[in-house]
Amino acid sequence: QPTWMPKVKLYYFGTYGGILKVHTFAENLATDEDRDIASLVKGMEEDPYIGVTEAAIAALKELGLDKSGKVGIDDTRFVAALEGVLSPDRVVDATNFLIEIRMVKTPDEISILREAARKNQNAITSAISTIREGATWDEVHRAYEIQVASEGARVFANFNGAGVKSAGAGRPDRVYPIKKGDQVCFDSMLKWKRYMGDVQRTVVLGEPDKKMLTYWDAFTAGIDTAYEALRPGIETGKLREQTIEAVRLNGLPSFELAFTHGIGLDHIEVPFIAGGTLGDFPVEENMVLNIDLELHEVGWGGMFFEETMLITKNGAERLYDLERELISV
């Protein structure tokens, strides 16, 4: 979608001692898009900037911010490039502030995220359909990638694996022939129009054993608690505590990993605090958030549930309609 920003600075890449120019134009431009591109490029040619630094300096001067005022920047390493134009004492680290702004989505963004969820659901459903005795995780993973491509989207990542190799997202070797009773765990992510789709599910081939059922019953308690509590006003830290407590009280006392994160242009849109720790934040209407519950029991396997929720005035709307239960095939 076109940007809603009132003014945008374009710049060229510098190369070979000059400017790397890309566009030439036909005499007659047939579409509005062509005419918009021509207008932007020709405006840039009147006063060309080489590189983002020149463009940023020009913008600061036009706004009078080289003389006074505070400037928020989402990467304070860029301050060094503005030396002589903007003194460090007038720079504010606006990383979290800009993340927080992005967390409340526009109608266009919500529409794209709905599309991303639908495409991701189609892809994970296709992958689930390939699960059979003797199949490997690589085959299942490949089915996901093929369906993502057929949806016109792009694979971002597809964790986790099957059986004892379904715990631990970073395993270098996930080759494993699936057996009856094994869980197959998905953490499946794609990009659509630069926005993320992200969903997790746990599938079992055949009937789950007693341990898996016990664990999933505990997960269900946590999932239900999260759905019930997710609404404007709740702090994500409180939501996490309630979810973890519900899982622990219902059969999985060692459970640790549940959290909520924003999703959009980035996989995880969450304010950060010192040391790279994920920060808590109050939930607001029109945020798009993922609720995420994961178990990594090395030597046994994993259990996963995650999906995307649009925060409404009084609660939350699911963007996926995949079944919420342990999926048996």
Regions found by a protein language model. Name each.
Residues Q1-V329:
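Active-site neighborhoods and metal-handling regions in enzymes and metal-associated proteins
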